Amino acid sequence: ETAAEKFQRQHMDTEHSTASSSNYCNLMMKAREMTSDRCKPVNTFIHEPKSVVDAVCXQENVTCKNGQTNCYKSNSRLSITNCRQTGASXYPNCQYETSNLQKQIIVACEGQYVPVHFDAYV
């Protein structure tokens, strides 16, 4: 799995325009293999066409959380869902809180149009 493929698996959900129910994160985190060996504590899904997310790589250049300079912030707010593990849940029964948001996203890119890491939303 390449970094770009991993980004697609962990962060892209183009089929849904928003999280359909409060159970969305529980289902999606499992379906996208983020609970197979541990519970990934936090993850964000983006409900926009791939072309829209790829285009962020040519928008505002910002510094990533880790200090690298290959992060880019979207010009507009995008439809995203944030999944956060609930305090009471433990592997293998990972449980998540689902939050629907409209936020600008920050992604790290390789080359001109290849998002490889979700850094933050603002």
UniProtKB/Swiss-Prot annotation:
What SUPFAM superfamilies does this protein map onto? RNase A-like (SSF54076)
Reactions catalysed according to its record: an [RNA] containing cytidine + H2O = an [RNA]-3'-cytidine-3'-phosphate + a 5'-hydroxy-ribonucleotide-3'-[RNA]; an [RNA] containing uridine + H2O = an [RNA]-3'-uridine-3'-phosphate + a 5'-hydroxy-ribonucleotide-3'-[RNA]
* Species this chain originates from: Notamacropus rufogriseus (Red-necked wallaby)
List the EC numbers from the record: 4.6.1.18
Q: What is a single cellular component term in the Gene Ontology annotation?
A: extracellular region
The subunit structure is: Monomer. Interacts with and forms tight 1:1 complexes with RNH1. Dimerization of two such complexes may occur. Interaction with RNH1 inhibits this protein.
Which protein is depicted? Ribonuclease pancreatic
Please cite one Gene Ontology biological process associated with this protein.
defense response to Gram-positive bacterium
Please give the Gene Ontology molecular function terms for this protein: lyase activity; nucleic acid binding; ribonuclease A activity
Q: Which family does the UniProt entry place this protein in?
A: Belongs to the pancreatic ribonuclease family.
Q: Read off the InterPro entries from this record.
A: RNaseA, RNaseA-like_dom_sf, RNaseA_AS, RNaseA_domain
Q: What is its main location?
A: secreted
* Keywords, ordered alphabetically: Disulfide bond, Endonuclease, Hydrolase, Lyase, Nuclease, Secreted
The source's superkingdom equals Eukaryota
Task: List cystine links.
Answer: 25-83, 39-94, 57-109, 64-71
On tissue specificity, the annotation reads: Pancreas.
Q: What does this protein do?
A: Endonuclease that catalyzes the cleavage of RNA on the 3' side of pyrimidine nucleotides. Acts on single-stranded and double-stranded RNA.
Gene3D superfamilies given for it? Answer: Ribonuclease A-like domain
Lyase listed as a keyword: yes
